[in-house]
């Protein structure tokens, strides 16, 4: 595999890497607090029914699609991260760097979360298989739970986390800052 000509640290500057690390810290620490303070599938109203903290576990892909596919999801996420790093490195002029940083922070947060078995009300341990099903859980911790307008197809938006928020913010930034005509030329 041929490495890009641009030096790595001219694209992934120390300040950008620190931002990704900070986003990763916010994501994993928020998940830790939720997993140690709540029980599985517990829901705590924060702003009435509009916003609740609801502990759920996503063993699938985006928005909980293809549940109970933890290992394929782990490999797919790892592959996506490697792809994003090399794509960003090769195309450093495409999009706003902060958009990429948000996406990377979120991708790393959910990727690392998949390496742990969660024990609600207690903590977590490294591993991929719960020893006590129903008490221990695998998958990404989701806990931000918002009501969705009734005229749409479902009552509540799927629960999400800080990492998911980072990815969404990053994608919006990239959509508004990428030069789509320039991408067509490459």
From Swiss-Prot:
Keywords, comma-separated and alphabetical: Aspartyl protease, Cell inner membrane, Cell membrane, Hydrolase, Membrane, Protease, Transmembrane, Transmembrane helix
Chemical reaction(s) catalysed: Release of signal peptides from bacterial membrane prolipoproteins. Hydrolyzes -Xaa-Yaa-Zaa-|-(S,diacylglyceryl)Cys-, in which Xaa is hydrophobic (preferably Leu), and Yaa (Ala or Ser) and Zaa (Gly or Ala) have small, neutral side chains
EC numbers: 3.4.23.36
UniProt GO molecular function: aspartic-type endopeptidase activity
Intracellular or extracellular location(s): Cell inner membrane
Pathway(s) annotated for this protein in UniProt: Protein modification; lipoprotein biosynthesis (signal peptide cleavage)
Record-annotated membrane-spanning stretches: 8-28, 44-64, 66-86, 97-117, 157-177
GO terms for cellular component: plasma membrane
Membrane topology: Multi-pass membrane protein
NCBIfam families: PRK14783.1
Function statement: This protein specifically catalyzes the removal of signal peptides from prolipoproteins.
Protein name: Lipoprotein signal peptidase
Organism: Leptospira biflexa serovar Patoc (strain Patoc 1 / ATCC 23582 / Paris)
């Amino acid at each position: 595999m041929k490495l890009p000509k641009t030096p790595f640290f001219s694209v992934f500057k120390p300040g950008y890497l620190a931002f990704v690390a900070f986003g990763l810290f916010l994501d994993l620490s928020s998940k830790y607090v939720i997993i140690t303070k709540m029980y599985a599938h517990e829901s705590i109203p924060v702003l009435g029914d509009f916003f609740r903290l609801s502990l759920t576990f996503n063993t699938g892909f985006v928005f909980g699609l293809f549940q109970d596919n933890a290992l394929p999801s782990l490999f797919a996420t790892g592959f996506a991260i490697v792809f994003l790093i090399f794509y960003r490195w090769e195309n450093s002029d495409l999009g706003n760097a902060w958009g990429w940083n948000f996406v990377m922070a979120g991708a790393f947060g959910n990727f690392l979360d998949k390496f742990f078995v969660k024990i609600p009300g207690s903590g977590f341990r490294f591993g991929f298989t719960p020893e006590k099903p129903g008490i221990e859980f695998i998958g990404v911790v989701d806990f931000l739970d918002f009501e969705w307008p009734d005229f749409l197809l479902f009552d509540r938006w799927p629960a999400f986390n800080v990492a998911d928020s980072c990815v969404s913010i990053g994608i919006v930034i990239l959509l508004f800052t990428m030069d789509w005509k320039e991408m067509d030329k490459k």
